Design a protein with these regions (language model features):
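Transmembrane and membrane-interface helices of multi-pass
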Residues: 2-194
Length: 194
């Protein structure tokens, strides 16, 4: 398997890009949770929450990834074929995988500064404060300049890395037979949205 990992010619399953990026993002979520929990270990230990933290965290990560990648998985099953529509969808899928993964990295990078300021993980306040960009920007520049610079640089690196990985992941995916598409589409719907 390893000799085929970054080669161009090996055909891949239709949903390989979705599974591959889901695995990558599960690793990102887990490493972030590990880092945050070690940083806040007194709080976690005070409630004997280590097992619960990682089990419930994994559950929420899977749910989040199903919502993020469920629609592209369904559309890949329904739209991808080796024709013009398939090539267009391949480009859209590459963008979706990259943008979704970069969003996850950005949110995980923003979490420590948000916790320091508001004592919570990013939530609806994170979005609500974005309607006041001048105030948010001045607060970030005054109190979290190093975090902003680090997050910006790391997010830009993530864009490049994820774009290349997504290009590799969507290359050589093989279309599914039309007779199997409705069955797999129903499975994707059941696993992603129910």
């Amino acid at each position: 398997m390893s000799r085929y990992l970054f080669t161009k010619g090996r055909p891949r399953s239709l949903l390989f890009p979705i599974f591959f990026f889901s695995l990558i993002n599960l690793i990102v979520f887990t490493l972030s949770r590990l880092g945050l929990s070690l940083w806040q270990q007194e709080r976690v230990s005070a409630v004997n929450g280590w097992g619960e933290l990682f089990l419930q965290g994994l559950r929420m990560d899977v749910v989040s990834l199903c919502y993020l990648f469920g629609v592209p998985a369904l559309l890949t099953v329904l739209l991808y074929h080796q024709n013009a529509l398939g090539r267009i969808w391949q480009r859209i899928l590459r963008f979706w995988l990259t943008a979704g993964s970069v969003f996850i990295v950005f949110m995980e990078l923003a979490t420590p500064a948000f916790i320091e300021t508001y004592d919570y993980r990013p939530n609806r306040l994170f979005i609500e404060y974005l309607i006041y960009p001048k105030e948010v920007f001045s607060m970030l520049m005054e109190g979290h300049l190093s975090a902003v610079i680090f997050s910006l640089v790391f997010t830009l690196i993530a864009v490049v890395v994820y774009w290349k990985l997504a290009g590799w992941a969507v290359r050589n995916i093989t279309p599914m037979r039309w007779t199997w598409r409705p069955v797999v589409a129903l499975l994707v719907i059941a696993l992603s949205f129910l």
